[in-house]
């Protein structure tokens, strides 16, 4: 009985100390710039110029990374916009099913050719 009470107390203490920021929460929204986009380019191919290229919720490193692209992945480029330290393209990674923003300097041919 004492062991069960101790485990319950430890579990409650651990749960109380964990801070979670959920997508769409004010804290996350405040740090991530405008992320609106449209399918304007539509080109598909292998556009990551390396491996482990972050795919983010917006055009900034302050935005959450939802996945990583690899050079072998097939993607569709949607459009680009100015963001943190240059331009970023919105894309869909067919290999992983993830979509989001990647910095154009990490994409073959500087990313999408249509502005959002």
What kind of region is each of these model predictions?
Residues 19, 37-40, 95-102:
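Short, exposed beta-strand "edge-strand" segments with a Pro/Gly-rich flavor and a Y/T-containing core
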Residues 23, 49, 84-85:
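Short loop/turn segments at connectors of secondary-structure elements within structured domains
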């Amino acid at each position: 009985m004492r062991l069960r009470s101790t485990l319950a107390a430890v579990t409650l203490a651990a749960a109380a100390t964990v801070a979670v920021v959920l997508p769409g929460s004010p804290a996350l929204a405040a740090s991530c710039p405008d992320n609106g986009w449209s399918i304007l380019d539509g080109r598909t191919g292998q556009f990551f110029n390396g491996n482990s290229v972050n795919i983010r919720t917006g055009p900034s490193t302050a935005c959450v990374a939802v996945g990583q692209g690899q050079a072998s992945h097939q993607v569709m480029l949607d459009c680009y916009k100015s963001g943190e330290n240059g331009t970023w393209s919105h894309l869909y990674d067919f290999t992983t099913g993830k979509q989001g923003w990647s910095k154009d300097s990490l994409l073959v041919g500087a990313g999408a050719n249509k502005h959002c």
